[in-house]
Amino acid sequence: MLSTRSDAQELAQYQWKHRVIILCGDSHSDSYQKQLNMLSAEELDAKFADRKLILIKDSKEHCDDVFKIMLYGLDGGMKLSSSTVVKAQEIFDLIDSMPMRRAEIMRRNGKS
């Protein structure tokens, strides 16, 4: 799921419903475009849905950095902040290592 953040949205609206990736900075920078292309690949839609993950694009006016990617967990806490491009699989692996995600997987697999 991809949305555009044109003004300062509250992360609280996503808490306990979605994990959130925020991509912010100069949307014309190489890093921003590379990260956006990596995370917008159609083949990742199922992985995003399975992890309750959404991607929000933020404009430079809300971000002092040329490029920054941030990941927030279901609890609303920041789990990752980077000014360099992060591979999608690294993000998925990080999420999959989180206790809430591991509990989701166990419930889905019928294990308590």
Protein language model features and the residues they cover:
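Non-catalytic interaction/Regulatory regions outside core domains
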Residues: 1-112
